[in-house]
Each structure stands twice: as C-alpha cells, then as structure tokens.
Amino acid sequence: MTNTIIEKAKERFAHTHESLAREFGAIRAGRANASLLDRITVEYYGAPTPLNQLASITVPEARVLLISPFDKGSIADIERAINESDLGINPANDGSVIRLVIPALTEETRKELAKEVKKVGENAKIAIRNIRRDAMDEAKKQEKEKEITEDQLKTLEKDIQKATDDAVNKIDSMIAEKEKELLTV
C-alpha cells in the first residue's frame, strides 16, 4: 500500500516534468522550432482547430518555419491566427505556403524570456509541492486508519520527501538548461 502512494506521486511528478518541457518548448529561443506553433488555433470553417492539424510545419533553415496548409483555402485563416497570437512574428504568405522568419533575440528580449522561464519553472515547483502534500496526507490517513504503523509512516514520509527533492532538482536543471539556451548568443 505504501509503495502505491510513492508510485502515484512519481507518476504525477513525471506529468509535471512533461508539461514543463512542453511549456519550455513554446518559449522561442531565437531558433525555429515547430513547437512554437503548438498553442496556435485557427478559426477554420467556424471551428477552432489546432494549426498542426491544418498544415505541415517544417524547418528548412535555422530561423525559418515553413507552414504548408493541406487546404490552400485555409491559408488566410492560418495567417490571421498567427498575426493574432502572442508570438510577435509576422507571417509571409506567398499564396501556397507561409514562411515565418524567427527574428534574432535582443539582449532585453532574452532577459525577459529568462524571467518567463523562471516563472513557469516556479509554477511547476508549486505543482510538485502540492503533489507532495497530497501524498503526505494520504500516508497520514493510512496511519490514522491503522493500515500502516508509525514507523512505516516516518519511512514513507522520508521516501516521499526524497522523491520530491529529486523532482524539484530535475525542474531546477530544466530551468538552468533553458536559461542557458536563451542567454547564449
């Protein structure tokens, strides 16, 4: 029973890490990356549709994204969605494909993005601590219901704390890696 608490917590930690990696992927680092467009939805025939379901996205050069719509009639809708997004990138429409040239980041922009990385990372740490709290509460509940002894509870709490520390350390290394990526020119 005690192992299931730790296993559940570790599974939730892994989901938090995956979510953080996705969020970091959406923060542009001056290089073209198709994941920059993951959060863009296009109003297509009246329904919000993810961009990656309407077009293939390729990276022909280091700072260029090429969007090739499956339906050429959707090109204006895709262009509008990109313009309305918070990417700050102007699409170039040549009638059949859309090119996005990722501008080089200024020093000021790099520092702003690094702050954003820290903020997103801190939110992930809060999620980890909430998972730890839930696991600790579950362990105390089991001890209260006499499913585990007090000694088993103490051991379980130590194991939960160690798993939490490992998860937080992984987040710290992910933050440091993304900041390094952003701040290197």
UniProtKB/Swiss-Prot annotation:
Cross-referenced InterPro entries: Ribosome_recyc_fac (IPR002661), Ribosome_recyc_fac_dom (IPR023584), RRF_sf (IPR036191)
GO biological process terms, semicolon-separated: translational termination
GO molecular function: ribosomal large subunit binding
Stored Pfam families: RRF
Superkingdom classification of source: Bacteria
A cellular-component GO term for this protein: cytoplasm
Keyword line: Cytoplasm, Protein biosynthesis
Intracellular or extracellular location(s): Cytoplasm
NCBIfam families on file: frr
Record-stated family: Belongs to the RRF family.
Function: Responsible for the release of ribosomes from messenger RNA at the termination of protein biosynthesis. May increase the efficiency of translation by recycling ribosomes from one round of translation to another.
Protein name: Ribosome-recycling factor
Source organism of the structure: Streptococcus thermophilus (strain ATCC BAA-250 / LMG 18311)
